[in-house]
Amino acid sequence: MPSCDPGPAPACLPTKTFRSYLPRCHRTYSCVHCRAHLAKHDELISKSFQGSHGRAYLFNSVVNVGCGPAEQRLLLTGLHSVADIFCESCKTTLGWKYEQAFETSQKYKEGKYIIEMSHMVKDNGWD
């Protein structure tokens, strides 16, 4: 019987490539462009976020993504230091990682990931 524990999520480093497959027993989200696994549904924090190009989900952890350099951006909720994230398989920009929030009320986002809905699809066990 396959294990449902894929282990810890890899660190988001721009110099390494990670190739992870999430167990079929988990509902997952995948890249709509290449179907690389991106996140388990269990890692979803909120569906109420806005990305650069539409609605987005906030995740606690993701797999198979790379990070660009961090930069400061003024977002709807204030100034943040963020790094764009991209699919390691097809290199499509998916959203961003919150590196630092400058307002106390936004600190919960630090280390979390935004993936835009237009770049992901539901996979495994959603029936």
From Swiss-Prot:
Gene Ontology molecular function: any one: metal ion binding
Q: Which GO terms describe its cellular component?
A: nucleolus
Keyword Zinc present in the record's keywords: the answer is yes
**Record's keyword terms, sorted:** Metal-binding, Nucleus, Phosphoprotein, Zinc
Q: In which tissues is it expressed?
A: Detected in brain, spleen and testis.
Q: Which residues, if any, are the signal sequence?
A: none
Which residues bind Zn(2+) per the record? 31, 34, 87, 90
Residue numbers carrying Phosphotyrosine: 98
Q: Which domain of life is it from?
A: Eukaryota
Checking InterPro entries in the record gives:
Yippee, Yippee/Mis18/Cereblon, Yippee_fam
Q: Where in the cell is it found?
A: Nucleus, Nucleolus
* Phosphothreonine sites (modified residues): 92-93
What GO terms describe the biological role, i.e. biological process, of this protein?
negative regulation of erythrocyte clearance; negative regulation of erythrocyte differentiation; protein localization to plasma membrane; regulation of cell shape
Enumerate the spans annotated as Yippee domain: 27-124
Iron-sulfur as a keyword of this entry, yes or no, is no
Give the record's family classification. Belongs to the yippee family.
What is this protein's name? Protein yippee-like 4
Species of origin reads: Mus musculus (Mouse)
Gene responsible for this protein: Ypel4
